[in-house]
Structures are given as C-alpha cells and as structure tokens.
C-alpha cells in the first residue's frame, strides 16, 4: 500500500532471484497468513454480537438503505463482500435476481443462513477471503464492500479482486471510515487500518483498475 507500491513491484523480480530475498518474501507471506487467521478467529468469536456492534458504531444511520439506492436498475447479480450476518443482503432482496454473500468467517455465514431460514432462493453464501474471491471473472453487476477494508492486511489485493469479478460496466460501492486516530478500534473491533483518506482510496482504486 502507499508510496512503496511501485518500488516493491520493481524489486520483486530481483528478490525472487536471491535466496535471502525469497526468504524475506516467505516470511512476509507467513505474516499475512497469520494475520488472516487472527482476523477470521476474531470475527468467529464476535459474530453473535456483530449486528449490535455495528449499531454501536453507526447509531441511527442505515447503511443498507444507502447501499440499496446505489444498485443499478438492470442489476442481475449483486455481491456483498464481507457480508457478515447477511443484513445488507436482506435489504438487497428484490433488487437483483441473484445475491452473493462472501465472508471469511464460518460463524458469520451460519448466522446469515439462519437469517434467511429456508428462503435461500437466489442467495448464494460463499466462504472465502477477499484477496482470493470465490467468484468468476465478471460475475457480479454490483459489488458492495462495507466497513471491511480496514480489517484487511492487504486492502489493495481485495480491490484487485473486485476489479476481476466485476462485470465490465458494473458498479462498485465501497464504504469505510475516513482516516482517524482512535487506536482503541484496533482492539475493540479488530481494525488493522485507522480508516483511509479519500485521496489514498481513490489512488488505490485507480491502481486496481476501478477508476
């Protein structure tokens, strides 16, 4: 992420040719995997309280209603990445023919299935990480990712995957926190990033091909 992005791209081939460089890359990969596992464990543990935690953060603001207004009229397939317990998917029913919810937490997806009970027609819940999405290229006409990027070790990887699975001409809606200094969010809510500036987000989206 950030200014070092292009530098890393330029030195990566040389690191792969060097034994010490390969060891550094392997170490970095292990760190990312450990962080992914910790994030998954965190969300499994707080899944039953997640909806209430969201209400604590957002208050009376209805994020699902805002997302619903952004769905294109001709939407066939909508995907909610980091869908949690399925609250946004519930609001999107009727707006698209098919809904896809992706989450890395098995417990979150279990609660999402309970939300819809036996009424799963047109809804596909998929386990997966956002840097390796379980969607085909160009599968979704509309993608939303809500208050999720700040939990990820590599937000840029998720943006690249969004670009891959978004249908050409499709629409993506990203909601997240502005940059802030509330360090307690790391321990209370598992945040890895303290929000993002609008300029940084725009630059990251452009690099991912989402401009």
What is the role of each PLM region?
Residues 156-171:
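A short glycine-rich, Lys/Arg-flanked "PGG" loop and its adjoining helix->strand segment in the class I
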Residues 171-211:
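C-terminal alpha-helical "lid/dimerization" subdomain adjacent to the S-adenosyl-L-methionine
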Residues 131-143:
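A short acidic, Gly/Pro-enriched loop at the edge of an enzyme's catalytic core
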Residues 47-56:
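Class I SAM-dependent methyltransferase Rossmann-like catalytic core
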Residues 57-77:
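Conserved alpha-helix/loop element of class I SAM-dependent methyltransferases that forms part
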Residues 79, 85-132:
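Class I SAM-dependent methyltransferase SAM/SAH-binding core
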Residues 1-41:
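N-terminal auxiliary segments of SAM/dcSAM-dependent transferases
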Residues 141-154:
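A short SAM/SAH-binding and catalytic strip from SAM-dependent methyltransferases
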